[in-house]
Amino acid sequence: MALWPLLNSGMLVRTGHTVLTWGITLVLFLHDTELRQWEEQGELFLPLTFLLLVLGSLLLYLAVSLMDPGYVTAQPQPQEEPKEEQTAMVPQAIPLRRCRYCLVLQPLRARHCRECRRCVRRYDHHCPWMENCVGERNHPLFVAYLALQLVVLLWGLYLAWSGLQFFQPWGLWLRSTGLLFTTFLLLSFFALVVSLLLASHLYLVARNTTTWEFISSHRIAYLRQRTSNPFDRGPTRNLAHFFCGWPSGPWETLWAEEEEEGSSQVV
């Protein structure tokens, strides 16, 4: 019963996004844009490419919004015996805590999401446009979605501009171009928002931090007493780990390495 309102709102948001996506695409095909001109001239390569990009962005959106973002399970999973060097590297008092809402033991960088009512590993933020959290499992796909969506929006913006006719009487212009101009304004707004989101997330990924950690570092137990980010290993390694999973390893290990380096510098 408690999950039904969440699922219902998620279905509404995803349906709205899908309808808006194909509605804008239809407007670009129905008006006298370059997209329609290519189609009428039999040059189908670019229209088909545009449609495939739109479809790809929509599939990525649905994948990110529907997949498990990295929920923390209450039952601990069986793990292999840790190697001796890893055991020596991890300190005895890593600042883990039990969630006061769902009562699971939170791994490092996890946070409870009140909208999803679950704890999420490497929590970044809860995205209302997707009605899902962005966390450890779906964050790379989220960034890929933003990149592809920006390409589609910029191309759509160009196509909408190509169909605008400005030298017409006001009444005739409103009837013939009003809907296309509204589409142009929507695409401009969405392109600006997605550009800012993509730039900010690439910046955070290059520093191996999350939106939540960046905003609330002064309130997070494992960050507030640090002068630097303990998970930062340089932009190249951070990006490689984020998109390719290399080098792999638990966040506790990175935190412990930084702790060990800090202790040695103090000594």
Curated annotation (Swiss-Prot):
EC code: 2.3.1.225
Cytoplasmic topological segments: 1-9, 65-140, 200-267
A Gene Ontology BP annotation from the UniProt entry: peptidyl-L-cysteine S-palmitoylation
Top EC class of this enzyme: transferase
Catalytic activity: L-cysteinyl-[protein] + hexadecanoyl-CoA = S-hexadecanoyl-L-cysteinyl-[protein] + CoA
Localization: Golgi apparatus membrane; Endoplasmic reticulum membrane
All residue ranges annotated as the DHHC domain in the record: 97-147
Membrane topology classification: Multi-pass membrane protein
Main localization (coarse): Golgi
Any one annotated GO CC term: endoplasmic reticulum membrane
PROSITE patterns assigned to the protein according to its UniProt record, in alphabetical order: DHHC
Lumenal compartment residues: 31-43, 162-178
Pfam families: DHHC (PF01529)
Active-site residues from the entry: 127 (s-palmitoyl cysteine intermediate)
Keywords carried by this UniProt record: Acyltransferase, Endoplasmic reticulum, Golgi apparatus, Lipoprotein, Membrane, Palmitate, Transferase, Transmembrane, Transmembrane helix
Transmembrane segments: 10-30, 44-64, 141-161, 179-199
UniProt comment concerning the protein's domains: The DHHC domain is required for palmitoyltransferase activity.
Full protein name: Palmitoyltransferase ZDHHC12
Gene this chain is encoded by: Zdhhc12
